Amino acid sequence: MELKDYIATIENYPKEGVVFRDISPLMADGNAYNYAATEIVQYARDKEIDMVVGPEARGFIIGCPVAFALGVGFAPVRKPGKLPREVIEATYEKEYGTDTLTMHSDSIKPGQRVLIVDDLLATGGTIAATIELVEKMGGIVVGCAFLIELDELKGREKIGDYDYKVLMHY
């Protein structure tokens, strides 16, 4: 299946000069959505995953069906003020300033094997902060999976030596 057929390209969104890759058509097509999730599940099967972690919001959309198929839990990564219990946080640099991500401080148990799933790998800030959060709790990041990588933004450099899978490159 050619997954790129299910990605809408929107010029100048959310601001002038940006090309937005919209996964909504993929999510709206049951076969394409299932195919994408299954590809990530196949990547993760032999990694003995204990937990799937996904940054909001589109990491939830892909991560939850993957966790379900693997028979493991899902832990959300959210922006500050969105989680009701004690959290840990990681701050990362963006083009114009910084951003912070949080997780419940008991989301990951020491030694748990974690797969991080998100829709998009762009500059790598979100994935780097998510890896930091998992490792602060003693989790072991055994893989990262993305629907899309924007190659020119070089986000893979922030992943370093972590194993990862990408379904589509732009």
Swiss-Prot record:
Subcellular location field:
Cytoplasm
Annotated GO CC locations: cytoplasm
Q: Which CDD domains match?
A: PRTases_typeI (cd06223)
Q: Which source organism does the UniProt entry give?
A: Lactococcus lactis subsp. lactis (strain IL1403) (Streptococcus lactis)
Q: What is its main location?
A: cytoplasm
Q: What is the lineage of its organism?
A: Bacteria, Bacillati, Bacillota, Bacilli, Lactobacillales
The record's annotation in PROSITE patterns points to: PUR_PYR_PR_TRANSFER (PS00103)
Name of the protein in its database record: Adenine phosphoribosyltransferase
GO BP terms in the entry: adenine salvage; AMP salvage; purine ribonucleoside salvage
> Per its UniProt entry, what is the enzyme's top EC class, as one word?
transferase
Q: How does it assemble?
A: Homodimer.
EC number assigned by the record: 2.4.2.7
Biological pathway: Purine metabolism; AMP biosynthesis via salvage pathway; AMP from adenine: step 1/1
Question: Which GO molecular function, any one, fits this protein according to its record?
Answer: adenine phosphoribosyltransferase activity
Looking at the keywords, is Transferase present?
yes
Q: What does this protein do?
A: Catalyzes a salvage reaction resulting in the formation of AMP, that is energically less costly than de novo synthesis.
A Pfam family: Pribosyltran
Catalytic activity reads: AMP + diphosphate = 5-phospho-alpha-D-ribose 1-diphosphate + adenine
Which keywords does this Swiss-Prot/TrEMBL entry list? Cytoplasm, Glycosyltransferase, Purine salvage, Transferase
**Family, as annotated:** Belongs to the purine/pyrimidine phosphoribosyltransferase family.
Top-level division of the source organism's lineage: Bacteria
Q: What Gene3D superfamilies does the database record attribute to this sequence?
A: 3.40.50.2020
